[in-house]
Curated annotation (Swiss-Prot):
GO terms of molecular function: beta-N-acetylhexosaminidase activity
Localization in the cell: Lysosome
Positions annotated as active site in the UniProt record: E357 (proton donor)
Substrates-to-products reaction catalysed: Hydrolysis of terminal non-reducing N-acetyl-D-hexosamine residues in N-acetyl-beta-D-hexosaminides
InterPro entries according to UniProt: Beta_hexosaminidase_sua/sub (IPR025705), Glyco_hydro_20_cat (IPR015883), Glycoside_hydrolase_SF (IPR017853), Hex-like_dom2 (IPR029018), HEX_eukaryotic_N (IPR029019)
SUPFAM superfamilies the record matches: (Trans)glycosidases, beta-N-acetylhexosaminidase-like domain
Name of the protein in its database record: Beta-hexosaminidase subunit B2
Source organism per UniProt: Dictyostelium discoideum (Social amoeba)
Task of the protein: Responsible for the degradation of GM2 gangliosides, and a variety of other molecules containing terminal N-acetyl hexosamines.
Top-rank taxon: Eukaryota
Signal peptide: 1-19
EC number(s) given by UniProt: 3.2.1.52
Annotated gene: hexb2
Alphabetical GO biological process terms: carbohydrate metabolic process; glycosaminoglycan metabolic process; N-glycan processing
Length: 564
């Protein structure tokens, strides 16, 4: 039996290492007491499947590698977090935050011998830069005696934050005996994400969300170990972002109370940073630009309202594009890109410029656009759109940013008769057929998956099981998988506002979070996921996040959250 266990430990250490030396830490942990009966041994495997029991490893999203035992360690009333990175305000805030989230009750001392007094958070790097591919790996070690304390080891503060979230889910309170405890010790967890880009898109144009709601939304993303808030800030319906360069642009907001000031924007970005969340701003262009024209009418096509094909009801659609023949369109569009990509604003390297659903019919009735096309030797409206998009892409590249665009741009540049190639720097975000990723990766483009089925959460017929069963890498050649950066689930806000946002997004986004974090070979594994998902929902309810029940918009009957 000992030989079998030693082999298991060696396999665990050697296989799929996340780059942190752990041999010294393992030697400090008493492993001889770990149970290796069939069920728990199966749970220790790195190849999780639907046949596994999730009674022991009740963590969401599932960690990459786990070893655990059957001993309960009790937590001292004087427990504390300590760290080697004492100068990091980000880590200090995270430690304080999780301490308050975990220890909400008064606890008593326990007479048992297994007492945990401290967890050391050891971080290798002081670099707190948030960019695509930042290191989120972490390791957790909890002794079965408590004598040696516990450890969270990470390359960056953001890995430590992910580890603290896992620890939160491991600690429980015994209300009868009045003490905190960690069951199934000792624990060894080695974890790192499957994809570097794991996000949720939220549309704040169709309905406005306050800064406090957006901050709470960002917190919910971090609890799920997402790392991107894709902020679809503006659209045809409203332009709520304050611009110091073009102050009249917010005339396109719903009202003077529904505007994000420069201070608001910076506050949201800073809050996200403290939770390890990148904020990727999207300003869609040249389509969906009606709101731009409220303050600057010259950027919209002349006589568009008289064009039968362009008569779209507002505010439900209003998909009026920019006038790509207007100098003002370029001045404002390029100026906004420069302003919102400044060092004092969005430091994020990805910037989304949309490029989707350009309504060419709105250009039909504009003599100015037709004359401009003749002068520029532009033969089609598709070429006119490409002319504009190239300018926007080049502007972002010059600013040192990575352009992100919806799949329409990839399809436009690849359409018949178009000789211009989509610049290789562009990241393509797919929102129709996910198999389009076979083509985008074949052509060398970095790709994000956001197929409307099942990643569009405004579709009420999509349940969490359908989201969970979707495999973003299906069909992509193994050699091109590196080009699949991950994906985003999307919440369009036509029928959603602050009153129902969290119930609409969660728990379905939970499923996306795990599939983008943890590699599951057997995609039909909802049975394996459901008990953990139900428990994780309870954790979010405890933290004030109004996640809906798994299969309904409201509870079916009186019941316990944890036992339902």
């Amino acid at each position: 039996m000992k030989l079998k266990f030693i082999f298991l430990i060696l396999f665990f250490i050697i296989g799929n290492s996340i780059g942190i030396k752990i041999s010294k830490e393992i030697n400090k942990i008493k492993l001889n007491d770990i149970s290796i009966d069939g069920e728990i041994l199966l749970n220790k495997s790195s190849d999780s499947s639907s046949s596994q029991s999730s009674k022991i490893i009740n963590i969401w999203p599932m960690p990459k590698k786990v070893l655990n035992g059957d001993i309960t360690v009790y937590i001292s009333p004087h427990f504390q977090f300590t760290t080697n990175l004492t100068k990091s305000t980000t880590l200090k805030k995270a430690m304080d935050r999780y301490y308050k989230l975990i220890f909400t009750e008064d606890s008593k001392s326990h007479s048992g011998i297994s007492i945990l007094n401290e967890i050391k958070i050891l971080v290798k790097s002081e670099d707190e830069t948030l960019q695509i591919g930042f290191d989120e790996s972490y390791e957790i070690y909890i002794d079965d005696s408590g004598d040696d304390g516990g450890k969270i080891i990470a390359e960056t503060v953001y890995g430590a934050i992910r580890g603290l979230e896992t620890l939160y889910q491991m600690i429980g309170f015994d209300y009868q005996r009045e003490y905190y405890q960690i069951k199934h010790c000792p624990w060894i967890i080695q974890d790192s994400p499957r994809y570097p880009h794991r996000g949720v898109m939220l549309d704040t144009s169709r309905h406005f969300y306050s800064v406090d709601v957006l901050k709470e939304f960002i917190e919910a993303l971090a609890y799920n170990k997402f790392n991107v808030f894709h902020w679809h800030a503006v659209d045809s319906q409203s332009f709520p972002l304050t611009s110091t360069t073009f102050p009249k642009i917010t005339k396109g907001s719903w009202s003077s109370q529904e505007i994000y000031s420069t201070r608001d924007i910076k506050e949201i970005i800073q809050h996200a940073k403290e939770y390890g969340i990148r904020v990727e701003l999207e300003i869609d262009m040249p389509g969906h630009a009606y709101s731009w024209g409220i303050g600057y009418p010259s950027v919209l096509p002349a006589n568009f309202s008289h064009s039968i094909q362009c008569q779209q009801p507002c505010p439900t659609e209003c998909n009026i594009p920019l006038d790509v023949s207007s100098k003002e369109s370029y001045v404002i569009a390029m100026g906004l890109l420069e302003e919102f990509n400044g060092a004092s604003m969005f430091n994020e390297s990805f910037f989304h410029i949309g490029g989707d659903e350009v309504a060419y019919s709105c250009w039909n009735n504009s003599l100015r656009i037709v004359d401009w096309m003749k002068r520029e030797n532009i033969s089609s409206f598709q070429d006119a759109a490409i002319f504009f998009e190239i300018k926007a892409i080049e502007q972002l590249i010059q600013l040192g940013k990575t352009p992100v665009m919806w799949e329409d741009a990839y399809l436009l540049f690849g359409s018949s008769g178009i000789t211009e190639k989509l610049p290789e720097e562009v990241v393509v975000q797919i929102y129709h057929d996910p198999l389009l990723a076979l083509n985008t990766t074949r052509d060398g483009y970095k790709t994000l998956q956001s197929p409307y089925w099942p990643y569009y959460l405004d579709n009420p017929s999509v349940d969490w099981e359908k989201v969970y069963e979707f495999e973003p890498s299906n069909g992509i050649h193994e050699k091109r998988l590196r080009l699949l950066l991950g994906g985003e689930t999307c919440m369009w806000s036509e029928l959603v506002d602050a009153s129902n946002l969290f119930a609409k997004v969660f728990p379905r986004a939970f499923a996306t979070a795990e599939r983008l974090w943890f590699s599951i070979e057997n995609s039909n594994s909802t049975t394996f996921a459901k008990p953990r998902l139900e428990r994780f929902r309870c954790f979010l309810l405890e933290r004030g996040i109004g996640a809906a029940p798994l299969n309904s918009t409201s509870p079916d009957d009186p019941n316990s959250c944890y036992s339902s």
